[in-house]
């Protein structure tokens, strides 16, 4: 059985999600201890439990220790299944983090997988669902992944109530992909939304972001608005946010910012724009989030690649550490300092369904 110390690196929930995701793909049993050891409230929270439950259902797994606050679980998968699965994370637990855990297993399932999730789509400490829709899954397509993510309803902190539907078709293996440099920025797209709030909130977020981007010299900027009149607003809300993504010659890079009580709409827009410009300024092909989220996919894919990331996060280091436990033949070499631009050279294991 593979043993994973959950206090390694950044010591958060990502170690748990990645470990159980790769256990589901490889069907190798795993014991994870010291779960979220470096967090103020260690142990499993509801969204972590739902991620494990989802993968347990997809693999007929035996799971021990799965309860709120637990700092150790054992996950013993039996067989990877296709089908339709429904999970309610409750209130504003992150649907994006659950989807990150489920996606690798869904791709290697023996048939189509559909996952319906309720929870938070736009919540702190988690990629917003629009980042997955417009950056993460489109980049996975370059590996040959066939996925679809439909946003049914948004859910913000603290009430949640969001709904998404994810679907994937199986792959026999992933085609390797990677770029070091992003190439020229062709255009910047964005989506600024607000629910249970006046329309001007979404407009001001978009306008502020556009001004920062254009002032930097970017010309082709187009940010869509999403807003609902009170009589047709199905959300629990209130909440707002913006996601921006740069379409470049060789890649996609994204950035986001969430609204909050007392935070001016202009600040939300400016924050997202500055994050995007900061990552674009490195010239690398991947933004700081994708630099980490791509690790399992370049590892499972067939062949060698090089990817350039805007910032080497502790998340990325942690990801590599965990993936190597499940794929010992994996070769990874990282050139760069923590929180600085970096290049990762990978020889994937060519995992076959």
Swiss-Prot record:
Catalytic site positions: 315 (tele-amp-histidine intermediate)
Keyword annotations of the record: ATP-binding, Cytoplasm, Ligase, Nucleotide-binding
Localization of this protein: Cytoplasm
GO CC, any one term: cytoplasm
GO molecular function: ATP binding; RNA-3'-phosphate cyclase activity
Main location: cytoplasm
Chain's role: Catalyzes the conversion of 3'-phosphate to a 2',3'-cyclic phosphodiester at the end of RNA. The mechanism of action of the enzyme occurs in 3 steps: (A) adenylation of the enzyme by ATP; (B) transfer of adenylate to an RNA-N3'P to produce RNA-N3'PP5'A; (C) and attack of the adjacent 2'-hydroxyl on the 3'-phosphorus in the diester linkage to produce the cyclic end product. The biological role of this enzyme is unknown but it is likely to function in some aspects of cellular RNA processing.
UniProt-listed Pfam families: RTC, RTC_insert
InterPro entries (UniProt xref): RNA3'-term_phos_cycl_insert, RNA3'_phos_cyclase_dom, RNA3'_phos_cyclase_dom_sf, RNA3'_term_phos_cyc, RNA3'_term_phos_cyc_type_1, RNA3'_term_phos_cycl-like_CS, RNA3'P_cycl/enolpyr_Trfase_a/b, RPTC_insert
Organism field: Ignicoccus hospitalis (strain KIN4/I / DSM 18386 / JCM 14125)
Family (UniProt): Belongs to the RNA 3'-terminal cyclase family. Type 1 subfamily.
GO biological process: RNA processing
Listed name of the protein: RNA 3'-terminal phosphate cyclase
Enzyme Commission number(s): 6.5.1.4
Substrates-to-products reaction catalysed: a 3'-end 3'-phospho-ribonucleotide-RNA + ATP = a 3'-end 2',3'-cyclophospho-ribonucleotide-RNA + AMP + diphosphate
Enzyme class: ligase
Chain positions recorded as ATP binding sites: 100, 289-292
SUPFAM superfamilies: EPT/RTPC-like, RNA 3'-terminal phosphate cyclase, RPTC, insert domain
